[in-house]
Amino acid sequence: MNKRKRTRSRLDIVYTILDFLRLILITVVAAVVILVFVARKEEVKGTSMYPTLQEGESVIINMAANYVGDIKRFDVVVAREYRSDDLWVKRVIGLPGETISYREGVLYIDGNKVAEPFLDKSYVEQVKSRTNTKYFTQDYTSEKLGRDEYLLVGDNRNESLDSRNEAVGPFKREQIIARGVFVYKPFSKARYVGNGG
């Protein structure tokens, strides 16, 4: 009888260890799936989205959100630039079928004036003063965007290579791989950056 209890006790220990190992395996597989298909860690390079995102900040890109709902104006998105295969974080200004223009620093969509509430007003004034320019965003007019095209622009207009540049142009929907980013480093500035409208 005593021998049977010891054998059962050993089996209980083995089953407990196996359950623990199974839990670890499931956790590792789930983490790999999340990191490959749902989220991705990146570091902000450059100042094209300053002050919204700052150079050197570490972010988690939310690729899953890309498959839920439509891309909206002023969403912050991550897009793959075809020429370099680099990932660019930009803001959606123009949607398919629209004509976008900036005149005297003001955004117009299909001829209608549209406010850009996400722009940091103090930074805009600082840049205009430093560069001795009247407008934060220089004049620009797009062709009518195609049915699958988006005009992506950096928040730091004078420092951003984006859709306004003829060499870049509009981005296709298939190039947009994620919507929204979560800044996690430095921890003191942790925040979600998504829709600015």
Please report, for each region that a protein language model flagged, where it lies by residue.
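Aromatic-capped interface at the extracytoplasmic side
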Residues: V33-M49
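Hydrophobic membrane-insertion alpha-helices, especially the h-region
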Residues: D19-F37
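Intrinsically disordered, low-complexity boundary segments flanking structured domains
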Residues: V28-A31, T47-S48, A167-G169
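Soluble "head" domains of membrane/secretory-pathway proteins
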Residues: N2-T16, P51, E55-G197
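Short, functional N-terminal and low-complexity linear motifs
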Residues: F20-I26, E42-G46, K144-R147
